[in-house]
C-alpha cells in the first residue's frame, strides 16, 4: 500500500509499505479522511518528537521514520474472526490511543481502571508515538477502538471527532476540578477568554456556547483577521492582539472584574506576557495549546499568588461506555450529529491524495485563511 513517510524533519516521501494484516480482534480500516493536526505540524517541523525509547529519549526520524495521521475515520475493509462490533463495509471513527483495554492487558493500570485511559501507563498512539498512522491507505486497529458512524455523516466531518473529543475531554477536566468559578451556582463565570482562534479555539467557543449553553461574554484573541471574523460569527468577542494592549483592553471591557475562565489554545509563548494579569483571583486557566516556545515558567509565580486553578489536559481518550465504546468519541460524534458544532466552517482546506499533504504543511498552513486541513480519500467511498 501507499504511505506518506516522514523520513527527516520537513521531508515527506510517498513509499510502498506492507499492508497491515488484522489480528482476530482487530479490523483493517481503509482510510476515508484524516485531519491535519497541530501535533502533526510540530513533528513535521522538528518541534516535537513523541516516539521515545525506554528512557524517554526521542528516537530520531533517520533511525525510525514515521507515518503520521491520528485524526481519522474510514471504512472497515476486513474484520478479524473474533470481531462482533463491525463488519466489512461499516463506516467507523477511530480512537487512536492504545491502552490497557484495547491491548488486552490484565490487570489494567491505575489510569485505565479510573477511566483515564489517555494517561495509560503502557499507552501508545497511532500516528504520534512511532506507530504507523493514517497518512496511508490502511490502518489496523483494535475492535474496542472504533465507533460506528451514522450513514449520513461525511468522512470529512467525522475527521473532526478526535479534535472535538479533545475539547470535550478538556472541558470535562475543568468540570471535575474544584474551582471557585463555574457555569452554575452562586459564583458563576461571567467572562471567559479563549487565546487562539485556530480549530481548537473555535471548537472550544462552540462547545461553551452550544453544549455548555454559556451565555456570558467569551473573548477570543488571535492575530488573523479570517479567524477573528469566524469567532465573531460563532458568538465570540474578537480581540486582535496586534492592535490592542490585552491587559488594559480586558480591564476596560470587564469593568475591572477580569477573566474568570481562560482557555489557552494557541500554543504561543507570547500569551504569557499578558495572561497572568488579565485573570481574576482564583480564576481557572485551562492549558490546552502545546509548545509555548521561548517562555520560562516565571508566570507560575503569579498563578501561585492569585491561587489560580490551573487545569492541564491531553488527548481525547478517557472512559468507556458499558458496551466498550470510547465515551468521549461517542459524545463528540453526537454533538456533531445534533448540529451543535459547525464543522464546515473549520474545514477550510481539503486534499484528495497523499501527494497533496506536503503542501498543507508548508504553504497552506501559513495562509491567512487556513484553519483546518483534511485529506478525504475518494476511494474509501
Where are these regions (language model features)?
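ADP-ribose/adenylate-binding Rossmann-like module
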Residues: 279-296, 309
Amino acid at each position: 500500500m501507499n504511505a506518506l513517510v516522514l523520513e527527516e524533519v520537513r521531508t515527506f516521501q510517498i513509499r510502498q509499505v506492507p499492508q497491515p494484516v488484522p489480528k482476530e480482534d482487530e479490523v483493517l480500516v481503509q482510510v476515508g479522511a484524516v485531519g491535519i493536526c497541530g501535533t502533526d505540524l510540530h513533528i513535521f517541523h522538528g518541534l516535537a518528537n513523541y516516539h521515545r525509547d525506554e528512557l524517554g529519549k526521542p528516537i530520531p526520524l533517520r533511525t525510525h521514520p514515521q507515518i503520521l495521521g491520528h485524526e481519522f475515520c474510514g471504512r472497515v475493509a476486513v474484520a478479524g474472526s473474533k470481531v462482533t462490533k463491525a463488519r466489512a463495509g461499516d463506516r467507523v471513527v477511530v480512537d487512536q490511543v492504545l491502552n490497557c483495554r484495547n491491548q488486552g492487558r490484565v490487570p489494567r493500570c491505575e489510569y485505565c481502571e479510573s477511566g483515564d485511559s489517555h494517561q495509560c501507563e503502557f499507552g501508545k498512539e497511532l500516528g504520534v508515538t512511532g506507530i504507523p498512522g493514517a497518512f496511508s491507505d490502511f490502518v489496523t486497529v483494535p475492535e474496542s477502538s472504533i465507533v460506528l458512524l451514522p450513514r449520513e455523516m461525511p468522512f470529512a466531518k467525522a475527521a473532526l471527532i478526535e479534535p472535538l473529543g479533545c475539547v470535550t475531554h478538556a472541558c470535562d477536566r475543568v468540570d471535575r476540578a474544584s474551582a471557585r468559578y463555574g457555569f452554575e451556582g452562586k459564583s458563576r463565570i461571567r467572562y471567559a477568554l479563549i487565546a487562539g482562534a485556530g480549530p481548537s479555539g473555535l471548537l472550544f467557543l462552540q462547545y461553551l456556547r452550544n453544549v455548555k449553553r454559556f451565555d456570558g461574554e467569551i473573548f477570543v484573541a488571535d492575530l488573523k483577521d479570517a479567524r477573528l471574523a469566524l469567532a465573531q460569527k460563532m458568538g465570540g468577542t474578537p480581540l486582535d492582539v496586534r492592535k490592542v494592549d490585552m491587559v488594559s483592553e480586558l480591564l476596560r471591557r470587564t469593568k475591572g472584574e477580569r477573566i474568570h475562565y481562560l482557555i489557552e489554545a494557541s500554543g504561543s509563548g507570547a500569551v504569557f506576557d499578558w495572561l497572568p494579569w488579565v485573570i481574576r483571583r482564583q480564576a481557572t486557566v485551562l492549558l490546552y495549546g502545546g509548545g509555548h516556545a521561548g517562555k520560562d515558567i516565571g508566570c507560575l509565580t503569579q498563578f501561585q499568588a492569585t491561587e489560580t486553578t490551573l487545569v492541564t489536559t491531553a488527548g481525547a481518550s478517557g472512559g468507556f461506555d458499558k458496551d466498550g465504546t470510547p465515551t468521549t468519541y461517542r459524545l463528540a460524534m453526537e454533538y456533531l450529529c445534533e448540529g451543535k458544532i459547525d464543522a464546515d466552517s473549520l474545514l477550510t482546506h481539503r486534499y484528495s491524495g497523499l501527494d497533496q499533504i506536503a503542501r498543507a504543511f508548508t504553504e497552506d498552513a501559513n495562509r491567512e485563511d487556513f484553519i483546518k486541513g483534511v485529506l478525504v480519500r475518494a476511494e474509501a467511498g
